[in-house]
């Protein structure tokens, strides 16, 4: 289980390592382009959602405990990037099977 820390430790949010590794790539790419966006994460206990305004001026940490074992699914990255660029911001969508829906990669 990884941790996303937004601004300060009091704003820590647990996210599974695989999902967090993919979110990290999306956040990194969006901020590299100076494109702030809303990130919505579901509470693990099912009690609702938390929304974070992702912007270059806010310090963030991504603590991924098993990063060496996470294989990146480029199709999932592309799907998450599309969501982050949409009107509702970035929310975690189910991971697509790379082999069922092969598409040309948009990431270079």
Model-found features: residue ranges?
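Intrinsically disordered, low-complexity boundary segments flanking structured domains
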Residues: 1, 24-28, 39-40
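Short, extreme N-terminal segment that most often corresponds to the first beta-strand
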Residues: 1-16
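Short secondary-structure junctions and interdomain/linker hinges
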Residues: 30, 34-38, 87, 91
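Charged, amphipathic alpha-helical segments
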Residues: 17-31
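Sterically constrained small-residue positions within well-ordered secondary structures
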Residues: 6, 30-32, 43
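Short, structured protein-protein interaction patches enriched in aromatics and acidic/basic residues
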Residues: 35-69
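Mixed-charge, glycine-accented linear interaction segment located at domain edges/termini
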Residues: 67-108
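Histidine- and/or cysteine-centered catalytic micro-motif in compact active-site loops
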Residues: 9, 18, 42-44
């Amino acid at each position: 289980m990884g941790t996303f820390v937004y601004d300060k430790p009091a704003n820590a949010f647990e996210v599974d390592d695989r999902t967090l590794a993919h979110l990290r790539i999306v956040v990194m790419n969006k901020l590299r382009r100076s494109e702030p966006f809303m990130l919505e994460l579901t509470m693990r206990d099912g009690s609702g959602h938390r929304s974070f305004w992702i912007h270059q001026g806010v310090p963030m940490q991504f603590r991924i405990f098993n990063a060496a074992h996470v294989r990146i699914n480029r199709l999932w990255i592309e799907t998450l990037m599309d969501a982050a660029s949409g009107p509702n911001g970035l929310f975690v969508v189910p991971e697509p099977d790379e082999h069922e829906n092969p598409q040309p990669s948009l990431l270079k």
